[in-house]
């Protein structure tokens, strides 16, 4: 996975810099998201792996499948990615692009998993506290996992805060073993 990210990074960075310069971050994010989804389709996977097709043929097929959903700049981007045999990296390119976009917009996607459903007031309060701590706008996604027993697990990028009962029991068990 790290190798794929390394290969995808220059393409994501170039796309991000272009989109940012032209104030098109949202549209590029949507188009790259579509490209990532199309590249993961089973039929498209076979096309991308076909040894008899040239990179130009693969790019043309890819763009044709997406129809008018791509503007000219994204079509050119797809051609460049195809010329370097990197179309299978589109999901990683799109993910990195979205990370760069979130960083530029000073926002972060936060996943909160709790043992019980959080009501809207609790979610708003948690988002406010996290926003202050992370110094970013927080987009909160809440889910439930009864196996946590109690508490919450918060994931924001590389940051993981495990305040669950299950996590505390695991730490206690580890401490008792050593």
Curated annotation (Swiss-Prot):
Record GO cellular component, one term: plasma membrane
Entry keywords, A to Z: ATP synthesis, Cell inner membrane, Cell membrane, CF(1), Hydrogen ion transport, Ion transport, Membrane, Transport
GO molecular function, one term: proton-transporting ATP synthase activity, rotational mechanism
Domain of life: Bacteria
Subunit structure: F-type ATPases have 2 components, F(1) - the catalytic core - and F(0) - the membrane proton channel. F(1) has five subunits: alpha(3), beta(3), gamma(1), delta(1), epsilon(1). F(0) has three main subunits: a(1), b(2) and c(10-14). The alpha and beta chains form an alternating ring which encloses part of the gamma chain. F(1) is attached to F(0) by a central stalk formed by the gamma and epsilon chains, while a peripheral stalk is formed by the delta and b chains.
Family: Belongs to the ATPase delta chain family.
Protein name: ATP synthase subunit delta
Organism of origin: Pseudomonas fluorescens (strain SBW25)
Taxonomic lineage: Bacteria, Pseudomonadati, Pseudomonadota, Gammaproteobacteria, Pseudomonadales
